[in-house]
């Protein structure tokens, strides 16, 4: 990836430009789709609420996600040990999670649409496009970081602290 540059133009306004390698473009698009799929699955499995259907307000899950990546993308609204009124965390999550997922999906969709299946490796964003782009990239980073942490935990459980040696050992087992 080339470093980002800022270009000012009278006709096009301010633009932020970079050039991705083809593999980077493909991996970024695939990652955006993977995170979107997980978020959509979470939204689809939300319990149906009769009051929400009557009022038109979407209702989400009351419990935090079990998937570590989703748990980081959709964290609790209260910290462990903070004083809270019974049910506040669940109610807050239930009322806000769907909107948070919707915003994250729109940002990820922007990246996917921009890159497209045969999209350009040249990225040129307006000032208005920078925020959704960076939000989506950050969500992808957070999700994959949580997955990597789980992978490292699995390695420690199985006794291999070095991923390279673990992979090498697993290759010889088969």
Regions found by a protein language model. Give the residues of each.
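Non-transmembrane, amphipathic alpha-helical segments
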Residues: 12-27, 31, 62, 92-103, ...
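Short, glycine/acidic-rich hinge or "gate" loops at secondary-structure transitions
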Residues: 45, 151-157
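Hydrophobic/aromatic-rich, well-ordered segments within soluble, folded domains that form packed cores
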Residues: 124-150
